């Protein structure tokens, strides 16, 4: 990615969106400028780095301070128009020179600690991912030369509070944020980074020994599992709209059972073979309901009423009034059939189950008895 392509906006739904840079780039720049300030013994207010994607960033330095053989500097995180929990916070680096010839990297205040296997970092280490570790160490080595050593501490005073708005605790990263970024650049509306964060949670679950997973669209699904199924939510992973991707990731990781749990408004799309459930990709909820109601012998009057509905909830009221609630078991079986069709070339496909529930947390339907599914999940 050239500097020109970094400055060029990302167009999304007709809007020009600005790119940003990662916490990894912030930490790298802060460490580099702190090392330079120790060597030169004067404050520096701007620093440039080359990101892993080849982009040169020129960043403003905040809170520079020198005290003997130690310096501190901060870079303010700018996610561009892809605002996340870390946007606008300061990422600090403290660099202390020594004669060891080695560079040691640690995480201080506000940087999370790894407490579970599965994310590629040792247990008990700071949540500074591999690529940022490499770029930080390389930038400091470039600044101090081959003979000197340095202790580098990355810290973020707001980190612990900001981390509460992230997935970190679910990934076993406690006490702060993660220093992340494989390219160093934040691309607005990047589905790939979002999908990767969801997949990472699957990897954590598998590394902990789980072989069965419950995929839900969001928090409502997790609450249903806890309150109505009596199953430990440790097995629950959010799939958002990325149904097909998360199923494929679960297969890749070797899960033997996948249970899809959600409201018909989301899961009904899978019955039509739609594995990305965001409305900008496809809708077809009413069409799917009408088709399957017709297969079950529903009268034309009901089909017309459902076809004219704007929401699944409205359609469900008509379905209940006409006594066709058994469609939800039918749809759950159809969902499982569609999943197995998607996985037809998989050598050892997992068991697939589907459970549909209402907004008031009542079971609407499933491909087989929910008690049976719950019992297997508790094994």
Curated annotation (Swiss-Prot):
Keyword Transmembrane helix assigned to the entry: answer is no
- Top-rank taxon, per record: Bacteria
Q: Which SUPFAM superfamilies is this protein grouped with?
A: CbiD-like
Annotated InterPro entries? CbiD (IPR002748), CbiD_sf (IPR036074)
EC number(s) given by UniProt: 2.1.1.195
Alphabetically ordered keywords of this record: Cobalamin biosynthesis, Methyltransferase, S-adenosyl-L-methionine, Transferase
Pathway involvement of the protein, from the record: Cofactor biosynthesis; adenosylcobalamin biosynthesis; cob(II)yrinate a,c-diamide from sirohydrochlorin (anaerobic route): step 6/10
Biological process terms from the Gene Ontology for this record are: anaerobic cobalamin biosynthetic process; methylation
Coiled-coil regions listed: none
Q: Which reactions appear under catalytic activity for this entry?
A: Co-precorrin-5B + S-adenosyl-L-methionine = Co-precorrin-6A + S-adenosyl-L-homocysteine
* Gene3D superfamilies (alphabetical): CbiD-like
Which GO molecular function terms does the record list?
cobalt-precorrin-5B C1-methyltransferase activity
- Uppermost EC category: transferase
The Swiss-Prot or TrEMBL record describes its family as follows:
Belongs to the CbiD family.
**What is the name attached to this protein's record?**
Cobalt-precorrin-5B C(1)-methyltransferase
State the species of origin: Salmonella typhimurium (strain LT2 / SGSC1412 / ATCC 700720)
């Amino acid at each position: 990615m050239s500097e020109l392509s970094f400055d060029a906006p990302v167009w999304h739904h007709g809007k020009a969106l600005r790119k940003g840079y990662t916490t990894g780039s912030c930490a790298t720049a802060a460490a580099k400028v702190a090392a330079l300030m120790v060597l030169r013994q004067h404050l520096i207010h701007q620093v440039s780095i080359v990101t892993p994607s080849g982009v040169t960033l020129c960043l403003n330095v905040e809170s520079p301070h020198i005290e003997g053989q130690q310096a501190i500097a901060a870079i303010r995180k700018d996610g561009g128009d892809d605002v996340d929990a870390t946007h606008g916070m300061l990422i600090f680096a403290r660099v202390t020179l020594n004669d060891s010839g080695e560079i040691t990297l640690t995480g201080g205040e506000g940087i999370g600690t790894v407490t579970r296997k599965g994310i590629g970092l040792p247990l008990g280490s700071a949540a500074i991912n591999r690529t940022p570790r490499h770029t930080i160490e390389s930038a400091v080595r470039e600044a101090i030369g081959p003979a000197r050593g340095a202790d580098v501490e990355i810290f973020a005073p707001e980190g612990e509070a900001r981390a509460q708005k992230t997935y970190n605790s679910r990934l076993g990263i406690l006490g702060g944020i993660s220093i992340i970024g494989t390219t160093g650049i934040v691309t607005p509306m990047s589905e790939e980074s979002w999908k990767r964060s969801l997949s990472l949670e699957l990897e954590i679950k598998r590394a902990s020994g789980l072989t069965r997973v419950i995929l839900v669209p969001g928090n409502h699904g997790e609450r249903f599992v806890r309150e109505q199924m009596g199953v430990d939510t440790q097995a629950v992973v959010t799939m958002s709209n990325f149904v097909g991707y998360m199923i494929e990731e679960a297969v890749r990781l070797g899960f033997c059972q996948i249970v899809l749990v959600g409201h018909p408004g989301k899961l009904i799309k899978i019955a039509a073979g739609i594995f990305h459930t965001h409305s900008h990709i496809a809708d077809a909820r009413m069409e799917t309901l009408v088709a399957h109601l017709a297969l079950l012998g529903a009268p034309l009057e009901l089909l017309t009423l459902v076809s004219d509905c704007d929401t699944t909830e409205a359609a469900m009221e008509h379905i209940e009034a006409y006594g066709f609630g058994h469609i939800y078991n039918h749809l759950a079986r159809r969902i499982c059939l569609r999943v197995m069709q998607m996985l037809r070339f998989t050598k050892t496909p997992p068991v697939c189950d589907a459970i549909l529930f209402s907004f008031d947390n009542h079971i609407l339907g499933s491909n087989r008895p929910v008690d049976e599914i719950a019992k297997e999940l508790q094994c």
